[in-house]
């Protein structure tokens, strides 16, 4: 049926054909041509927008992590577990996935005025001098882990903090050391680790003073690790302020990070347990949250607020609701406080744990034999609990916990999906951790491939896969299920594959 018959009224007084009918048909034909052409143009624009959006996301990740191009390396014949020790923390070591790397040494800007990324106050001042060192401030790096979340890339003997998982030429703990060194110097930078990791940490951090490497006999979660360091440092310097920062987190934006830590130290000196709240970039269900309370009104720390409450990892709907309010920040597990205040909180909320840690600290620097004896007696009976649950949450209810909101980039690299976000890639292509020459793909989008065995990994027509090919183990899963890898580790252990863990 013609368009004219559909739209031209029919009556006995009007002809069904003629000049008018032809002109109407021609008009609608032109309209249809325009509509079809517009549809084609819109489809093309949508395609271009999609490509631009994907390219922008890739570029943002690269800029955020300081990566401007993917570093390619010749074939490595080893699993790449160890990052060889540098001659100094300021010299970049070889990556376990790269043949060589030329990353610039850590630079300390000469200015003491740093632009703040926090909305209300555009500029804050470092009162500690141009080298950023903060007198009386000690850094504690808890370095633990069972190597389950990035298995089989990470193992019990080589957890993720010992690996260069971002192709930057430094392991995560080396990057953490580099980041915090300007605030303290090596003399006031301590690491808490288990006996199985002490040797590797000493090799990767040759400037770490041995009396600042605190070996805990077994894992007791973050409260015992941080509490042990606090108790020891309190014996050495009762006026010390300590900051605890995990060994295996990724941080981008050094100026913003140092700005937030410096502000947290100023607040801690006023008698608070201070955490640093990360501005959430998406409604994550894998992180805990901090709810912002009233501003503290401290002139030297204008961004600091009370912590209204801590929230456990929420479901997706709750996380989205948190972000919509603008009053929540991710809880990154960074805490800054006076050692005496932390121990006072511990005595109040966990007196038995506090008593045990103080017994150990009392003999720590006296005699190694006596230290080991007390550790054998005390450590097995200590409560296994996180610092959040032990002191931060109950203290927040009494108005004794503060938060410094910050906007530097942060990720705890909790699974292969989050690791993939930190690596560069072409649009719609999988991320490659290692030698990209060992990976061939055809019609493959997203995902991450770790060619750790040295053999070729070929993928055809699969999207968002996680493929970790090590000399002794092959893992294949999806990015959506990557948080469940630790279930496989448990199953491997129960099935007698303990040697692969």
PLM feature spans:
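A short, charged helix-loop
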Residues: 293-329
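Residues at the starts of beta-strands that form the adenosine-phosphate
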Residues: 187-188, 241, 400
């Amino acid at each position: 049926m013609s368009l004219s018959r559909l739209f031209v009224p029919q009556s006995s007084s009007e002809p069904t054909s003629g000049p008018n009918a032809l002109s109407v048909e021609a008009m609608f034909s032109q309209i249809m041509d325009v509509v079809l052409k517009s549809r084609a143009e819109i489809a093309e624009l949508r395609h271009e927008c999609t490509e631009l959006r994907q390219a922008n996301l890739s570029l943002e990740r690269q800029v955020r992590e300081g990566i401007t191009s993917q570093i390619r390396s010749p074939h490595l014949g080893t699993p790449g577990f160890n990052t060889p020790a540098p001659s100094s923390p300021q010299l970049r070591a070889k990556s376990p996935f790269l043949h060589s790397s030329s990353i610039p040494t850590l630079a300390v800007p000469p200015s003491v005025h740093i632009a703040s990324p926090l909305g209300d106050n555009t500029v804050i001042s470092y009162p500690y001098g141009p080298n950023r060192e903060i007198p009386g401030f000690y850094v504690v790096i808890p370095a633990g882990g069972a190597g389950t979340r990035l298995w089989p890339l990470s193992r019990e003997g080589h957890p993720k903090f010992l690996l260069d998982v971002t192709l930057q030429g430094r392991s995560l703990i080396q990057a953490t050391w580099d980041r915090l060194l300007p605030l303290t110097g090596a003399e006031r930078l301590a690491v808490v680790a288990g006996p199985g990791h002490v040797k590797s940490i000493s090799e990767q951090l040759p400037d770490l003073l041995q009396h600042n490497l605190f070996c805990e006999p077994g894992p007791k979660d973050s409260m015992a690790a941080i509490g042990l360091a606090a108790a020891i440092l309190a014996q050495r310097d009762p006026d010390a302020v300590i900051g605890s920062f995990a060994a295996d987190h990724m941080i981008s934006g050094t100026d913003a990070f140092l700005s937030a830590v410096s502000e947290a130290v100023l607040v801690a000196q006023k008698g608070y347990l201070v955490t640093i709240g990360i501005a959430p970039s998406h409604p994550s269900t894998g992180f805990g949250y901090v709810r912002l309370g009233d501003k503290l009104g401290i002139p030297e720390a204008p961004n600091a607020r009370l912590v209204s409450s801590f929230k456990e990892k929420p479901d997706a709907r709750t996380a989205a609701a948190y972000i919509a309010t603008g009053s929540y920040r991710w809880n990154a597990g960074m805490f800054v406080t006076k050692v005496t205040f932390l121990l006072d909180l511990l005595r109040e909320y966990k007196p038995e744990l506090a008593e045990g840690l103080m017994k150990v600290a009392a003999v720590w620097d006296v005699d190694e034999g006596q230290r080991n004896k007390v550790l054998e007696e005390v450590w097995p009976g200590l409560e296994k609990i996180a610092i959040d649950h032990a002191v931060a949450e109950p203290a927040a209810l009494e108005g004794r916990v503060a938060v410094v909101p910050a906007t530097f980039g942060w990720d705890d690299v909790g699974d292969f999906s989050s690791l993939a976000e930190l690596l560069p890639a072409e649009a719609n292509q999988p991320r490659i951790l290692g030698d990209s020459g060992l990976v061939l793909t055809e019609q493959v989008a997203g995902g991450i491939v770790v060619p750790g065995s040295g053999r070729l990994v070929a993928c055809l027509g699969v999207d968002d896969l996680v493929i970790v090919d090590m000399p002794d183990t092959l893992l294949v899963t999806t990015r959506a299920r990557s948080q469940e890898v630790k279930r496989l580790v448990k199953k491997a252990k129960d099935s007698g594959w303990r040697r692969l863990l």
